[in-house]
C-alpha cells in the first residue's frame, strides 16, 4: 500500500516520570501497529517542531517552559530540563513540503502525521496544499476520532499521554521520579498523571485510535481508487 506514517516527535520535557521523546515514541508505537494491519511505511521520527515562544531579554522560553491554561500546577517560567526541539513554524512546514515532495515522487498517496500537538496542527494545516501540489491525502490520528476522552495524545504528560506510554512502553514510565510533595510535577497539562493514569486506559485509547485511524485510511484508499 502506498502510504507513509510520520511520527512528529520532540525532545521535550514530559514531567519527571516520562522520557523526553514521549511525543515521537507514542506516535511511532501507534503507527507500527496500524501499519501491521493495513500496510504502509513508518518513517523515522522528527524531533524538531514549532511551539509558542517567549524571549525575555535574551532568555528564550517555549512550550511548557511557560505556565499555560490547563497546567496541572502553576509555576514560574523556566527552561524545562532537556527540552531541545523548537523550530519556527514556517521552517517546519517547509521541511514538511520537502518530505511531501519526496514521498509523492516515490508514489505515496496517503501520509499520516501525528505527535507533538503544535506539530500535528501545523501538519494538518497543510492538508489542502498537500493535495493540490503533491497529490497527497494527509491526516492525523485525530481526523476521524470524535471521542474527546480517547483522542490520542490530547494532553501534555497528563493522564492521557502517561497512560499511552504505560501501554506501549511501560518500562519508560517511572513514578518513583516524582517527589513526594509533587514539587517537580510541573510542565504538565491535563489530568493528574500519577493518580489517574493506567495501562488499561492507555490500551483503551490505543485500540480506539487504531480502529478510527484504520477506518479512515481504508476510506481514503477507496476514494483514491474511485478517482
Language-model features, listed with the residues they occupy:
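Extended, histidine- and acidic-residue-enriched regions that form the cofactor-binding/catalytic faces
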Residues: 1-227
Amino acid at each position: 500500500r502506498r502510504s507513509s506514517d510520520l511520527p512528529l516527535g520532540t525532545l521535550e520535557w514530559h514531567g519527571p516520570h516520562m522520557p523526553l521523546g514521549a511525543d515521537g515514541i507514542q506516535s511511532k508505537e501507534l503507527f507500527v501497529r496500524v501499519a501491521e494491519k493495513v500496510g504502509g511505511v513508518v518513517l523515522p521520527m522528527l524531533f524538531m517542531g514549532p511551539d509558542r515562544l517567549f524571549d525575555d531579554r535574551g532568555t528564550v522560553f517555549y512550550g511548557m517552559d511557560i505556565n499555560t491554561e490547563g497546567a496541572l500546577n502553576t509555576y514560574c517560567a523556566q527552561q524545562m530540563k532537556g527540552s531541545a526541539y523548537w523550530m519556527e513554524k514556517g521552517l517546519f512546514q517547509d521541511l514538511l513540503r520537502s518530505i511531501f515532495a519526496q514521498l509523492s515522487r516515490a508514489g505515496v498517496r496517503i501520509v499520516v502525521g501525528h505527535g507533538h500537538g503544535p506539530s500535528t496542527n501545523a501538519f494538518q494545516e497543510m492538508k489542502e496544499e498537500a493535495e493540490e501540489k503533491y497529490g497527497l491525502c494527509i491526516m492525523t490520528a485525530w481526523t476521524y476520532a470524535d471521542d474527546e476522552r480517547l483522542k490520542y495524545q490530547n494532553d501534555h504528560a497528563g493522564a492521557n499521554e502517561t497512560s499511552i506510554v504505560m501501554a506501549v512502553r511501560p518500562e519508560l514510565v517511572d513514578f518513583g521520579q516524582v517527589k513526594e510533595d509533587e514539587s517537580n510535577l510541573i510542565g504538565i497539562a491535563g489530568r493528574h498523571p500519577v493518580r489517574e493514569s493506567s495501562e488499561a486506559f492507555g490500551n483503551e485509547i490505543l485500540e480506539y485510535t487504531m480502529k478510527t485511524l484504520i477506518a479512515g485510511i481504508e476510506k481514503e484508499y477507496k476514494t483514491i481508487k474511485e478517482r
